[in-house]
């Protein structure tokens, strides 16, 4: 099969897929809105079934149903797997109506960059592969539904499903937002803890008789905020609630700590520090209850992932695509789980844009074409 013909088909189909991305961005799908997430999933399922592709899904009660769409399911070779998530972070209505809008090469809307654009690019790549007669191996598209909560919404059922469906993949390409020709080979993991602190209330005029839970929280926060190593542990305490009125010593205070780590050793170090902080009181009479809110493993630098990058760059050299440069990211993603499962994977094959997790989020439509070509070339050449 001629890869240049494949690229030409992608170019020809591009306007159709720009409209598809606008459609799915107009379907708002915050993670907790199962009906909204499933509506986006149903959009892709309908497209796949019209083409005669195999469709599988995992019915869930609390999260959107994750989906696996397969082109050439009967082919006798290891699959190439594309993956991306369709859940977003903002409440319905925050973007106004309609949520999506086009301005030149920019498409604004919830999830345009993170990560609906990447999923649409994967579908475009598969569509073009089929139109060009590609039958050499299965090509999967796994659609994730609760990535934005670290898969807490489903109790990790979605990532277990993803790893199970992709277990035989020769390459797993995750379609989080792109950064030019840089591709993600390692990511930090995430630990989130809620600290619930209880002191002793009293009238503020007799504050020496009370124990201020907010002050205890402040001591703990300052200790956690010492973690600021870009290559190691970092912590952000971004949410705090405490007290009732100005003339009462605060009896209760809670705060949320978001800790990032690069490897398992750092993860264990962070867990030990958090436990020690919870057990130690800076103010006599204060107690602390620790709640683990969510977690996601790190995607450490692995030889098999670097080897996959080298293989892909060899393919790109043959077909005239720019080489990719590996980079480390501090944010988490689902490739942490596929890496832990031993599946060769890389991240950042989605679209370019800016404003992630804000009402200014946009995708560059021209980058959707680039993303589709990069993904299709891997399936064609690996």
What is each of the regions a protein language model found here?
Residues 66, 97, 138, 172, ...:
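Broad gene-expression machinery/nucleic-acid interaction feature
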Residues 83-84, 142-144, 172-176, 196-198, ...:
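Short beta-strand segments
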Residues 1-5, 12, 29, 56-59, ...:
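Metal-dependent amide/peptide-bond hydrolase catalytic core
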Residues 79-81, 107, 170-174, 192-194, ...:
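Short glycine-aspartate micro-motif
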Residues 109-113, 144-150, 202-211:
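Flexible, glycine/proline-enriched loop segments at strand-loop-helix junctions
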Residues 116-188:
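Acidic/histidine-rich catalytic neighborhood of metal-dependent amide-processing enzymes
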């Amino acid at each position: 099969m001629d890869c240049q013909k494949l690229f030409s088909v992608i170019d020809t189909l591009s306007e159709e897929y720009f409209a598809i991305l606008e459609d799915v961005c107009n379907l708002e799908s915050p993670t907790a809105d199962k009906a909204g997430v499933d509506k986006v999933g149903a959009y892709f399922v309908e497209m796949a079934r019209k083409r005669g592709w195999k469709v599988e899904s995992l019915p869930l009660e609390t999260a959107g149903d994750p989906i696996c769409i397969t082109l050439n399911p009967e082919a006798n070779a290891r699959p190439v797997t594309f993956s991306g998530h369709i859940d977003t972070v903002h409440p319905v209505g925050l973007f106004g109506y309609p949520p999506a809008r086009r301005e030149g090469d920019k498409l604004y809307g919830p999830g345009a960059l993170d990560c609906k654009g990447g999923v649409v690019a994967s579908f475009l790549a598969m569509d073009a592969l089929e139109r060009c007669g590609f039958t050499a191996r299965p090509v999967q598209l796994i659609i994730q539904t609760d990535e934005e909560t670290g898969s807490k919404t489903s109790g990790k059922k979605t990532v277990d499903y993803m790893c199970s469906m992709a277990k035989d993949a020769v390459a797993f390409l995750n379609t989080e937002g792109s950064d030019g020709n840089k591709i993600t080979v390692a990511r930090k993991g995430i630990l989130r803890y809620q600290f619930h602190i209880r002191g002793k209330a009293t009238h503020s005029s007799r504050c020496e008789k009370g124990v201020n839970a907010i002050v205890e929280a402040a001591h703990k926060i300052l200790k956690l905020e010492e973690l600021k190593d870009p290559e190691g542990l970092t912590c952000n305490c971004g949410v705090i609630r405490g007290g009732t009125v100005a003339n009462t010593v605060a009896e209760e205070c809670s705060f949320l700590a978001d800790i990032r780590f690069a490897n398992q050793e750092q993860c264990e170090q962070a867990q030990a520090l958090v436990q020690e902080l919870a057990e130690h009181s800076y103010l006599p009479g204060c107690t602390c209850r620790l709640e683990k809110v969510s977690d996601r493993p790190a995607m450490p630098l692995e030889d098999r992932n670097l080897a996959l990058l080298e293989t892909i760059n060899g393919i790109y050299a043959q077909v005239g695509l720019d080489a990719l440069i590996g980079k480390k990211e501090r944010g988490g993603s689902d490739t942490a789980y596929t890496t832990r499962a031993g599946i060769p994977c890389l991240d950042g094959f989605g679209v370019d844009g800016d404003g992630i997790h804000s009402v200014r989020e946009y995708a560059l439509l021209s980058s959707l074409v680039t993303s589709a070509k990069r993904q299709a070339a891997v399936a064609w050449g690996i």
